[in-house]
Amino acid sequence: MKKSVLSIVLTVVMLFSLTATVWGSAWPVVDSGYCGYWDDNYSDRENMTWQLMKDGTLEFFGEGYMEDFSYNRVPWKDYAAQIKEVVIYGPQDELKSCILSISSYAFIGCKNLTKVTIPHTVVEIGEDAFGSCKSLTEITLPDSIEKMGYGVFGSSGLKRIRLPEKLTTLPYGTFSGCADLESVDFPAGLTEIESRAFSKSGLVRIELPDTVTTMESDVFSECPNLEFVKLPRNLEVIETGMFKKCAKLQSVVFPENAKVIGRLAFMWCDELQNFTLPESVETIGLQAFIDCESLTEVTIPANVTIIEQNSFSGCGKLRAIYVAEGNQAYQSVDGVLMTKDGTMVHTCPGAKEGTFVIPNGVTTIASLAFFDCQNLKRLVIPATLTTINERGFDFCDNLLSFYFSGAAPDAGLLKKMDISSDATLYYLEGQPGWTSPTYLGYKTALWDGSSKLPGTLPAGDTNGDGRVGVEDVQHLYGYLTGQNTITIAEKMAADVNNDDEVDVYDLQLLYERLAQGTTL
């Protein structure tokens, strides 16, 4: 009897050893178990098993769907650091069914995993299945796969990948955080890319297939190396934050049918330079191009009817915003974006220099309209201006001369202009409410409404021709002897010794400096 039992045991051991050699690795088994999908009543389970071999190979056998585990219930989770290779065995002949799915979180955190074999029977991969597999640089996905869960390869070491032909949707966060990702081959039938699919990935260039018609928010946000993107031809909406914080993005080929540039779409794209918005664009969202520091000029297409606030704020090199002929909602005045009806200043480009004359009829300064205009020095303000919205003049550090055409503004309006204590408020003689030498604590001075603004002429230019020469000595002498008059701007330039008086001492100093060939 004992010999019979021993014989049976040896036979079973031999059969098991033979099975391990034929189906999987010949190495000793570290651990094993069942992993098949339970039915809704937990009364029956798919015939699927797993085993981890001593050499780090994790093997799967059986048929049907793998149980969709939660993060903490993956049976081999405690061995994550030991797993180097995953092999999912296919059928031994075409008549046998086989494994159809890979569970969510199946191999998440397997930092030493370098090789994966997936049979052509698998149709679905669960969310985060290969998340944070830092050593996994390549993987071959069979064309049988029709569906993938969120973040399948998030923060993995993938460098390149070919996506399955049956895949129509690229899920949320598929390649998010894949810092080494270099290239992706897209399937011909791909129609949708969900939010953050490539965010924080290492892509440098990417051309998306024209079959894609929907892309959700933040698809390429925070891709530090991304330089060039060609968007799908039929994409109509560039969603919120799609390229946010892509610091090296230089060139974008927009879809010819694009209608909406979403909020924050190109926020903080530091190297984005000039581009052409398609004529089809109708809406530019809130802060769409905010802080694009290399942008030098932009043209608003004729069909644009909505430009939300701060769309181009903080673009320090932006010299001008142009508007295409025929636009019914907006216009460009001296490179500054305004509403077509002339009642609101929308955006002053960040690199605007010198002087801007706000046209008569303007009633409103939009929020952040003059934000960070460091090169703007003088502003002419019409009597019609009544409203300045939030932070309309933030960080205009060199804007020190304000020329008012109307009555003295109230304290509330001046406060919203964020005027420096070093600034001078110029006003027209006869306009009510003004006081001299100060008004509400600000230094004041007269001007005559001339296009030659006080403070804009070089010292000594008493005739206002933009140059300083002997003619200015003659002109100043004529003024002092009552032979001719000078404007307020010329009078300020004539005060060459800066004592707030124009007299013979200024004439003498001007003559001496010209004779000596020195500047004032």
Which residues does each PLM region occupy?
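Bacterial N-terminal signal peptides
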Residues: 9-17
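Positively charged n-region of N-terminal signal peptides that target proteins for export
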Residues: 1-9
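Cellulosome-associated attachment modules in secreted, modular CAZymes
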Residues: 16-24, 451-520
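Short, T/G/N/S-enriched strand-turn elements that build extracellular solenoid repeat scaffolds
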Residues: 49-50, 105, 309-310, 356, ...
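Consensus positions within tandem repeat domains that build extended binding/scaffold surfaces
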Residues: 103-106, 126-129, 149-152, 171-174, ...
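Short, solvent-exposed loop/edge segments of extracellular or virion-exposed proteins
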Residues: 36-39, 89, 323-325, 351, ...
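Structural signature of tandem-repeat unit edges
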Residues: 57-64, 81-100, 111-124, 134-147, ...
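Surface-exposed repetitive/solenoidal architectures
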Residues: 25-111, 129-131, 152, 369-372, ...
